[in-house]
UniProtKB/Swiss-Prot annotation:
Domain of life: Bacteria
Organism: Edwardsiella ictaluri (strain 93-146)
Disulfide bonds, paired cysteine numbers: none
Keyword Ribonucleoprotein annotated: yes
Protein name (record): Large ribosomal subunit protein bL36
Length: 41
């Protein structure tokens, strides 16, 4: 999982990527390609 300051580029990496908010943090999850997971600081 990458830790990024901005998730704008991360959400465009793959068509299946979506932004989720969990426990006050923003995550990018990708079901079909899990290597694109990311979290915002």
């Amino acid at each position: 999982m990458k830790i990024l300051s901005s998730l704008k580029t991360a959400k465009h990496r793959h068509p299946d990527c979506r932004i989720v908010r969990r426990r006050g943090r923003l995550y990018v999850i990708c079901k079909s390609d899990p290597r694109f997971k990311a979290r915002q600081r």
